[in-house]
Amino acid sequence: RITAAGPACARSRALAGTTVPAPAEPDLAAAPGWAQARRQLAAFLTGRLAAAAGARTVHPVHAERGPGPGRDPSQAMGPVAAAIEYAGAGAIRYALARVPPGAPARVDPCHEAARRLDVPAYAVRYAHAHAASTLRQAADLGLNRGEAAEFGPRPLAHPSEQVLLDELSWLPERVAGAARQARPDVFPRYLERLAGAYFGCQERCPAVWPGMGTGGPEISARLWLAAAAATALRAGLDLLGVDAPDRL
């Protein structure tokens, strides 16, 4: 169902009947400092997640105003703009999105630019890219997932596969829960658990591997699982406004 739903796999009606403020998307590079950038992004993401969970959103009359439509080139570059220029908009946006209320909002651009799995933004995006690569490799090998109507989770019996299935099943509720609490920072952390579950599953139960022979029901099921993981991770990153590259 996740693969068939595409980006809508993260949506639900959990907050139907509620109304939530939805400020305009902030220009993070124009923010004078980290604290303001985090506040503006958190307010925006709360509204965005709430809308995905079925809430009615309204533009607040007294929304916090940013410094304008963009940074004045004649002014010195602020810390957020400098970090975005160094590490990329997606990495900095993700790092800010996961900062909880009350915690220091400062982000280390050198850390966020690193291509390591202990960097949360990179780990989640790499998990998506790995799943997309798995599907490309399967296609190159002539392996077919089969029809969606024929898929059943029965072959996915390994504990690591069950963990990934469980994490995937919570996606819409994690979106709604983050919006309900006005804590968008908890949603990136869910995506990190999902990425970790995917890596654990691929380490123990890979869908493709060098020298593999023909497929079968088990391989088809694993390919569907990889496709579901790729779809869910992309949907989650899209909600955060972070790109989900197919190759890293």
List where the protein language model places each region.
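Non-catalytic interaction-recognition regions
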Residues: 1-248
